[in-house]
């Protein structure tokens, strides 16, 4: 099964439920209850995260997975993309298979709350995962491409 990016899902949203979708990324947030859990997954390609829905009935290793997964963990998920027009997000992924690629420590520094720039300066290796820096790097990349194209088109 070919892996897709969060960006491609949001840029060209499906018109109907789509099975066989595989995505990988980092867990931004996780909310869980006894029978189901919600994970916001970001792969760094888009500013909005993809919501994953884990249900105990459809995921045999539900208990173990929810125990191992925390904010910052790296996961790969497969499932069915379900349209949710009445919810905040246009769709969500109902997970049928989940693999933990890398666990995160309990003291992982990036949490759901907003962090100050001073704090982000102390964790330089994780700054690209913060929304502020992802946006800044995208703007910088587009500006550099525009300057490069301008100079190239004029023979420089």
Positions of predicted regions on the chain:
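Class II aminoacyl-tRNA synthetase catalytic cores and aaRS-like
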Residues: 1-156
């Amino acid at each position: 099964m070919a892996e897709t990016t969060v960006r491609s899902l949001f840029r060209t949203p499906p018109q109907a439920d789509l099975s066989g979708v595989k995505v990988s990324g980092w867990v931004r947030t996780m909310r869980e209850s006894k029978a189901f859990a919600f994970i916001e997954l970001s792969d760094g390609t888009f500013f909005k995260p993809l919501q994953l829905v884990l249900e105990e009935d459809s995921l045999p290793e539900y208990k173990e997975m929810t125990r191992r997964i925390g904010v910052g963990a790296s996961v790969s998920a497969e499932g069915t993309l379900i349209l949710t027009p009445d919810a905040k997000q246009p769709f969500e992924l109902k997970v049928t298979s989940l693999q933990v690629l890398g666990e995160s420590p309990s003291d992982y520094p990036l949490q759901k709350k907003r962090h100050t720039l001073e704090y982000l300066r102390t964790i330089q290796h994780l700054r690209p995962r913060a929304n502020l820096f992802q946006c800044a790097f995208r703007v910088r990349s587009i500006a550099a491409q525009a300057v490069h194209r301008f100079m190239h088109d004029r023979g420089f």
